[in-house]
């Protein structure tokens, strides 16, 4: 891995495609409830980053594939780290909705 690869942002469109192709996967939006209401990716579940560690069981199966996004990719990166610390083993940061050009729900 070269130095600049470390700073490369995830591609949210690739992440959404992977989510759609993965049976049983959960698409997790870690933005605030207000941000979520303003527009979110269809099928996503909202658990704000600030509440993530208070969730007893986001999913009973800690191996379930979780695809995590936020606005820019920063909170989702933090959420992935926290979820891994909580024992979730199949977690992926897919970036931020700011770069998303697909359909959103309100």
Please identify what each model-predicted range represents:
Residues 1-18, 22-25, 33-64, 74-106:
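Rhodanese-like catalytic fold shared by cysteine-dependent sulfurtransferases
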Residues 29:
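N-terminal glycine-rich beta->alpha transition that marks the start or flank
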């Amino acid at each position: 891995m070269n130095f600049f690869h470390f700073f490369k942002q995830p591609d949210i469109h690739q992440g959404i495609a992977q989510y759609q192709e993965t049976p049983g996967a959960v698409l997790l939006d870690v933005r605030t409830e207000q941000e979520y209401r303003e527009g979110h990716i269809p099928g996503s579940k909202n658990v704000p980053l600030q509440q993530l560690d208070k969730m007893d069981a986001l999913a009973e199966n800690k191996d379930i594939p979780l695809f995590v996004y936020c606005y820019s990719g920063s909170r989702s990166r933090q959420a992935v780290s926290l979820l891994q610390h909580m024992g979730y083993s199949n977690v992926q940061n897919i970036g931020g909705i700011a770069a998303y050009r697909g359909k959103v729900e309100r």
